[in-house]
Design a protein with these regions (language model features):
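Flavin (FAD/FMN)-binding glycine-rich loop and adjacent Rossmann-like elements that form
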Residues: 81-82, 102, 116, 128, ...
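A glycine-rich dinucleotide-binding beta-alpha-beta segment and adjacent secondary-structure elements
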Residues: 94-98, 158, 162-193
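Short Gly/aromatic-enriched secondary-structure transition segments
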Residues: 27-29, 136, 177
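Short secondary-structure junctions and interdomain/linker hinges
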Residues: 57, 61, 106, 128, ...
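Mid-domain catalytic core of redox enzymes
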Residues: 1-112
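Conserved FAD/dinucleotide-binding core of flavoprotein oxidoreductases
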Residues: 19-24, 55-57, 113-155
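Residues that form or immediately flank small-molecule/cofactor binding pockets and catalytic motifs
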Residues: 75, 104, 126, 176-178
Length: 193
């Protein structure tokens, strides 16, 4: 702990991810005992991601939000090729878009937040596209970063509105997190999902 206190347990269950657990939460000796040090040498970081958090000024019923998640894949479906293309060209088509409708799935949502709904839109993003801002601070990354986020946001909204066009006039809040946001808040080195 930051105050020097050490917590021990015979069994550790971590939701921080195996790499973060082994490299930041365990001592090197404990990571070796658990067989994680050798295993991690063979494991790459998971994909970094972008997440668009959307708030709508209408309830899920009015918006006709589905209670299932959407997975959108381009018609030319070769995931590896699309992912590779997107990693080289940030303007290439997104290789996958995942859309979730939390407000429609929570039976208590309408009671707790009347007249409001949320949607999340997620896709992969190469961490390297954000390394120019690696040494900057959250909310202080500069105009170029904000312009990049705005362009990505518009592209992601465009895909969402192809699937759910009725949402467009009701948008009230929109915020995009990047791999740097995930790094900042979750301490995942490469903004992994």
């Amino acid at each position: 702990m930051s105050d020097g206190q050490v917590l021990t347990a015979p069994i550790i269950v971590s939701g921080a991810g195996v790499a973060t657990t082994a490299r930041q939460l365990l001592t090197e000796v404990d990571a070796q005992k658990a067989g994680l040090s050798q295993s991690l040498k063979r494991v790459d970081s998971s994909a970094a991601h972008l997440c668009l958090y959307l708030g709508y000024k209408a309830d899920a019923g009015t918006l006709k939000l589905p209670t299932a998640n959407w997975w959108y894949y381009p018609a030319e479906y070769d995931h590896d090729a699309l992912t590779q293309r997107f990693s080289l060209d940030p303007n290439a088509e997104f290789p996958v878009i995942y859309v979730s409708f939390p407000a429609a799935k929570d039976p208590t949502w309408a009671e707790r937040f009347p007249g409001r709904s949320t949607v999340e839109v997620i896709t992969v993003a190469p961490f390297e596209q954000f390394t120019p801002w690696l040494e900057t601070r959250w909310h202080r990354r500069g105009d170029e970063y904000e312009a990049k986020k705005a362009e990505i946001t518009e592209r992601m909204l465009g895909k969402l509105y192809e699937l759910e066009p009725q949402l467009k006039p009701h948008l009230e809040h929109c915020e995009l997190s990047t791999p740097l946001s995930t790094r900042h808040f979750c301490n995942y080195e490469h903004g992994e999902i």
